[in-house]
Design a protein with these regions (language model features):
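A conserved amphipathic terminal alpha-helix motif
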Residues: 137, 141-184
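Hydrophobic-ligand binding "helix-grip"
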Residues: 50-54, 58-67, 79-130, 134-136, ...
Length: 195
């Protein structure tokens, strides 16, 4: 017969499920008219984030480490700010070129949890970009002060990267007919700028 109050493992699992549902998160999947490698490289270029990522004021690379499977791990500290509020946090960014995935895990800062991932899949019109982020601030006060602002910025992330891609790689030529979706002429025709 179970103890009154239930089994601790079951309660822990229930608490994790409830916390996951209450934790702010955002997921989007969209097709962009740029090749997967171009989009991967754009998101992987974390040093440029202060130029276009919402709320990102500064970013400092702490380390770069190649892994045996060909992936690269970057540890970076980002300073995010709005008005008089500034917070810095450190993340571990795993760039998996072979799988066309970028995984970001939280190391230190004002969050209890912060994780996100990107994946870049070939698509007839360019690339299908999948972006997911989940976060929770440690401080309820900070959550109340900047939670809605941060949530709004997170929802603009994928837009910011798509706009940046158009600026860096050029806006792809598209055929638009009334009543039909936007179509790139051909992902193979898109040229990447020389570095």
């Amino acid at each position: 017969m179970p103890e009154p109050g239930g089994h601790p493992v079951v309660w822990d699992a229930c608490a994790q499920i409830v916390a996951a549902r209450l934790m702010p998160s955002f997921h989007t999947r969209r097709v962009v008219c740029h090749p997967p490698k171009a989009m991967f490289d754009l998101v992987a270029d974390v040093e440029r984030y202060p130029e276009f990522v919402p709320l990102c004021e500064a970013l400092e690379i702490r380390s770069r480490t190649p892994e045996s499977d060909g992936a690269e791990v970057i540890t970076a500290t980002m300073t995010a700010g709005y008005g008089l509020i500034r917070e810095s946090f450190t993340s571990r960014v795993r760039l998996d070129h072979a799988a066309a995935r970028i995984l970001v895990s939280y190391v230190d800062g004002p969050f209890r949890t912060l994780e996100n991932h990107w994946s870049f899949l070939p698509h007839p019109r360019g690339c299908e970009v999948d972006f997911f982020i989940q976060y929770e601030f440690r401080s309820r006060t900070l959550q109340m002060l900047v939670g809605a602002l941060f949530d709004g910025a997170v929802r603009r992330f994928s837009d910011a990267f798509e706009i940046r891609a158009d600026r860096v790689y050029g806006r792809p030529t598209a055929k638009v007919n009334i009543g039909t979706p936007l179509r790139c002429t051909s992902p193979g025709d898109m040229k990447l700028p020389r570095r």
